[in-house]
Amino acid sequence: MAKLHDYYKDEVVKKLMTEFNYNSVMQVPRVEKITLNMGVGEAIADKKLLDNAAADLAAISGQKPLITKARKSVAGFKIRQGYPIGCKVTLRGERMWEFLERLISIAVPRIRDFRGLSAKSFDGRGNYSMGVREQIIFPEIDYDKVDRVRGLDITITTTAKSDDEGRALLAAFNFPFRK
């Protein structure tokens, strides 16, 4: 079992129960899922780019990504409905906890010119979204085999009812928020 999951059950639950005066342990917010999304707009011209992006995402997440397709045709972007334009992975359970642990302790500190994550990226319901400009911050990606530096979106979905609860949950995991 991931260390972070044990830490959540032993420490974070107690801390949040006292902070927000919950009556039941089930009221304490928890991380539900983590979604990783990589949009590959250049995949229209070169299909190989999407395969490379999917391979990178598979290495980062540990599971095979789903290829996302365009929902509707947009002439300005030269895409048609059904064209593959990106890939995504939804992590739950053990893989989610392991990824979150790697994100906080290894990947985020490796971000170039890092000054902390924005605490304003909550959506109003306790879910946190962040963008990563380079996939090479993850140790699973071999820098020499990267054909192109791509970014990805990371969304952490929680059961929190408000942004304050979600922020307190992630701060309890020592998320490096900007002061």
From Swiss-Prot:
Does the keyword field hold Secreted? no
GO CC annotations?
Answer: ribonucleoprotein complex; ribosome
Gene3D superfamilies in UniProt: 3.30.1440.10
Under the heading SUPFAM superfamilies, the entry gives: RL5-like (SSF55282)
Residues in coiled coil: none
Q: Per its UniProt entry, which superkingdom is the organism in?
A: Bacteria
Q: Name one GO biological process term.
A: translation
InterPro entries for the chain: Ribosomal_uL5, Ribosomal_uL5_bac-type, Ribosomal_uL5_C, Ribosomal_uL5_CS, Ribosomal_uL5_dom_sf, Ribosomal_uL5_N
Signal peptide bounds: none
A Gene Ontology molecular function term of the record: rRNA binding
Checking PROSITE patterns in the record gives: RIBOSOMAL_L5
Which controlled-vocabulary keywords does the entry list? Ribonucleoprotein, Ribosomal protein, RNA-binding, rRNA-binding, tRNA-binding
- Pfam families (UniProt xref): Ribosomal_L5 (PF00281), Ribosomal_L5_C (PF00673)
According to its UniProt entry, what is the function of this protein?
A: This is one of the proteins that bind and probably mediate the attachment of the 5S RNA into the large ribosomal subunit, where it forms part of the central protuberance. In the 70S ribosome it contacts protein S13 of the 30S subunit (bridge B1b), connecting the 2 subunits; this bridge is implicated in subunit movement. Contacts the P site tRNA; the 5S rRNA and some of its associated proteins might help stabilize positioning of ribosome-bound tRNAs.
Q: Which NCBIfam families match?
A: PRK00010.1
Give the UniProt family note: Belongs to the universal ribosomal protein uL5 family.
Q: How does it assemble?
A: Part of the 50S ribosomal subunit; part of the 5S rRNA/L5/L18/L25 subcomplex. Contacts the 5S rRNA and the P site tRNA. Forms a bridge to the 30S subunit in the 70S ribosome.
Output this protein's name.
Answer: Large ribosomal subunit protein uL5
Species of origin reads Pectobacterium carotovorum subsp. carotovorum (strain PC1)
